[in-house]
């Protein structure tokens, strides 16, 4: 029996004593199965709103204020302390727009990762290097995408904007760090 078959059988057996339906439990457990580990490909910060992002190799991450040196540092809600986008989504957007490549600076996100579906981290905590983050929402595109990416940039980014996160445990994030569900 495959590992997934064993998991599903255990869930089915455990449900004999629970009020949850089999399908609800299976879905809940499937949402926790994220064996992929991603990798940090790019990091950018900006000290002022609408300023161009500065590319860095590493950044200190603080629990109360987010990324050191980023303009969202100390924002009131803390829900957008860190923004992340998938390299695979940048590739999709560049294809939609007929471009060879999109410079991550133009998307105004802090961290570009590859190898993991960021949307699968919704409602979960995850680790990048020694930093623990928690997803707080979907990062929707703003009107600057039209200016930064050209005609159709806003619509090309819809569904590909990444996620927002808050800091649970501080530390440092650097290029090449692993990103994984915890």
What is each stretch, according to the model?
Residues 2-182:
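Metal-cofactor-dependent catalytic cores
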């Amino acid at each position: 029996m495959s590992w997934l078959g064993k998991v599903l059988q255990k869930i089915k057996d455990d449900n004999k004593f629970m009020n949850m339906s089999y399908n609800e439990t299976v879905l809940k457990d499937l949402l926790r199965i994220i064996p992929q580990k991603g990798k940090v490909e790019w990091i950018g910060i900006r000290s002022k709103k609408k300023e161009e992002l500065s590319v860095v190799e590493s950044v200190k991450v603080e629990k109360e204020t987010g990324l050191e040196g980023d303009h969202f540092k100390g924002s009131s809600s803390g829900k957008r302390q860190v923004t992340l986008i998938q390299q695979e989504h940048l590739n999709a957007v560049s294809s939609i727009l007929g471009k060879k490549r999109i410079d991550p600076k133009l998307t105004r996100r802090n961290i570009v990762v590859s190898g993991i579906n960021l949307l699968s981290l919704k409602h979960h905590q995850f680790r990048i290097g020694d930093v623990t983050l928690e997803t707080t929402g979907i990062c929707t595109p703003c009107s600057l995408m039209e200016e930064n990416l050209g005609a159709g940039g806003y619509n090309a980014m819809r569904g590909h904007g990444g996620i927002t996160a808050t800091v649970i445990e501080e530390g440092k994030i650097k290029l090449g760090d692993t990103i994984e569900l915890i």
